[in-house]
């Protein structure tokens, strides 16, 4: 059962890392169309810090973090910066919702719980309000 739990947590870390890559590259795609657009520039950088936090969890477990399945080209361009902001609201809501069920798990390792809690909080209390203001 222990091996299964470890594998489940590994799959969970992969899923979380891809979720953060997705957010970063979504915002990178907006910056390609609207160079320097705020809040995308700062939040895209923040998403890279989220990726790094998750990559450290892999390293701590002597696992190689996977590369992103996402690129900026994965996303269709937004018609306007306001539409991009609405896309940011949707993405950050999905990000926060992604972490919610996992944070309820009793067997979630403490280091994973801490990172997931921080990433969910960043989505809810920093990124989401910034995108709501720019819609």
Model-predicted segments: where are they?
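All-alpha RGS (Regulator of G-protein Signaling) helical domain and cognate RGS-like helical scaffolds
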Residues: 1-135
């Amino acid at each position: 059962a222990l091996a299964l739990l470890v594998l489940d947590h590994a799959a969970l870390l992969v899923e979380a890392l891809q979720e953060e890559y997705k957010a970063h590259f979504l915002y990178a795609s907006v910056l390609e169309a609207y160079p320097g657009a705020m809040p995308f520039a700062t939040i895209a950088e923040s998403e890279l810090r989220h990726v790094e936090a998750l990559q450290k969890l892999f390293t701590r477990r002597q696992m190689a973090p996977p590369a992103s399945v996402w690129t900026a080209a994965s996303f269709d361009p937004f018609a306007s910066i306001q539409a991009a902001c609405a896309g940011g609201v949707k993405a950050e809501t999905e990000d926060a919702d992604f972490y919610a069920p996992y944070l309820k798990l009793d067997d979630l390792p403490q280091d994973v719980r801490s990172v997931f809690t921080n990433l969910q909080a960043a989505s809810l209390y920093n990124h989401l309000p910034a995108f709501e203001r720019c819609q």
